[in-house]
């Protein structure tokens, strides 16, 4: 996200975002969901340690969030995402917004000086 989001204050059911949008590497992201909703949902993939037990009649899924984590976890990406989140929290969204506004103004002012560009 490019701004702070209080999922509890907004009573958000689901929130997803890409890690690379907040300086983490590509290939990692976040899905926030209310636990009660995740507990009602079946997984859409199978694999890894998402299955608690298997019998001849079916399978018992692991507890949330593990039942949605099929396959090998991107450990390096998860670590990098956590560090990116800490970095953004450290510098603050206000700093990011101010910097983006300054860069946008600089770009727009520069583009206005190019005769072939009309804004």
Across the structure, where does each feature detected by a protein language model lie?
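Pyridoxal 5′-phosphate
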Residues: 1-119
């Amino acid at each position: 996200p490019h701004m702070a989001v209080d999922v509890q204050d907004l009573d958000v059911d689901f929130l997803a975002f890409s890690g690379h949008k907040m300086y983490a590497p590509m290939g990692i992201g976040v899905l926030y969901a209310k636990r009660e909703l995740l507990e009602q949902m079946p997984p859409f993939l199978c694999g890894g340690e998402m299955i608690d037990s298997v019998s001849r009649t079916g399978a018992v899924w692991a507890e949330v969030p593990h039942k949605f984590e099929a396959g090998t976890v991107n450990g390096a990406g998860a670590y990098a995402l956590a560090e990116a989140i800490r970095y953004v929290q450290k510098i603050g969204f206000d700093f990011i917004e101010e910097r983006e506004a300054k860069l946008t103004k600089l770009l727009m002012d520069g583009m206005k000086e190019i005769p072939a560009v009309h804004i």
